[in-house]
Amino acid sequence: MFDVIIIGAGVCGASIARRLSRYKLDILILEKENDVSMGASKANSAIVHGGYAESGKELRGRICYPGRKSFEKLNEELNFGFLANGSLVLAFDEEDMKTLDKLYQMGLENGLDDMEIIDQEKLRSIEKNVSDDAIGALYCKGAGVCSPYEYVIALVENALDNGVKLELNSEVVDIEKSNDTFKVETSKGETYESKFVINASGLNGAKVSSMITETDFDIHPRSGEYLIMQKGTGSRIKQVLFQTPSPKSKGILVTRTYHNNILIGPDAIDEEEIDLGTHEERLMEIYKLAQKSVKDDVLNLKEFIRSFTGLRPASSTGDFIIENSQTNGFINVVGIQSPGVTSSPEIARMVEGILVDLGINLTEDETYNPYRKPIIEYKELEDFNKVKDLVDLPLGNPDRLVCRCEQVSEKTIRDALNRGIELTSFDAVKRRTRAGMGFCQGAFCKNRVLEVMEDEYGHPIENRKFDSEGSGLSRINKKDINEIIKKMSK
């Protein structure tokens, strides 16, 4: 019997698990995929938002800024990668300036004290590569970027260190309640019992909710496509650059990532079905719109390395849904689209409060450890001529460079393999170490990573493909972009 079962190991489920792991509770996370952070938490803009883009009349508007204020301390404890580099919402005409004033007023209502509307002169002084057409901006000093999948991984690793249990490849197929006890059945045929159940299942939120309680909301996928440029390009931009938002999104952004790539996107398309593919027409429209924000020499399609699609779990209510359901003790945490990553610490606090109201006994665990060592130590890449001899070192040498593009050592990979979650794919290692995230996108290092995995675990790795291989996904890649460049040059 568990005290709490959490369905979903995305940013909400992970944040809640880590928050509750400080108490003497038996907690289980059930995740349907083969790793944590496999849904919206993996594929998004990676922004720690300011807290001005949503009205305080909405729950997501009220909890974004308190969530954002938690990130510096969280990163000090968990070492997942957070940089408070600031954000700029750009204005290109007087209508845009009116929009900035509305955003500023919403920010004030939400309690922000680190934003201002700046003129063209100050804008140029803090962001030299911003477009000459920008006439002003809303500047939020405390906004920033993080590595969202590393954030979720860190939360789960720390929760596991503090006694939480995790079951992967365990999709919830049925939930029943009898005599104040929930019975949760998974696709593995296992049944787990608990006093409380938290539904943090992302796009499956309405489906899971309807298994046990009356559900008056829908969750539908809203897709957004992105382009990523090679490492090092991010140094051309200091802040996160937004254009003025639409009703569906915060506008096309150009930003550096925590690991110093340029990230461009997303658009926002409501989908009938899940589609994680990327499309030439959409990506080229995103690229064209992004060029509006920066000087001509900032973006270069020849530096493109990858495209991806994120699916936001948009609710029919238009807002976050965080509440005890009509089936007492079954708590919905669904419809968590943007700014979900930023709000996640506050979401976890809210769920703790709901559990307290429902009568859970929270006793502090004196052995609780909030700290987690980093897997990746942030560093600039060395000149390859200085490190090329490390590539040829034999298997078993901790200094051997397994990935040459990102210069990932064997000791880093072995560290990632021993963090409480057995990794079963190359991509799982990639998300933790950046092996395969460089210019060649794993062409050189995939088999080398799998070799280390097999040596460390002592058994063959059955899944030897990239996550996207064999899944039917069609994504625009470097070869496709090169063909587009050729067409553009004619």
Question: What are the residue ranges of the model-derived segments?
Answer:
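N-terminal Rossmann-like FAD-binding beta1-loop-alpha1 element of flavoenzymes
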Residues: 2-29
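Flavin-dependent oxidoreductases
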Residues: 15, 175-180, 186-265, 269-279, ...
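Glycine-rich FAD pyrophosphate-binding loop
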Residues: 22-43
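Dinucleotide-binding Rossmann-like beta1-alpha1 core, especially the glycine-rich loop
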Residues: 46-126, 251-252
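Glycine-rich phosphate/pyrophosphate-binding beta-alpha loops
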Residues: 53, 143-145, 249, 330-343, ...
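Short beta-strand to alpha-helix junction loop
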Residues: 55, 60-65, 90-99, 138-157, ...
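Helical element adjacent to the flavin cofactor pocket in flavoenzyme catalytic cores
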Residues: 138-196
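C-terminal catalytic lobe of FAD-dependent flavoproteins
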Residues: 249, 258-259, 274-401, 408-412, ...
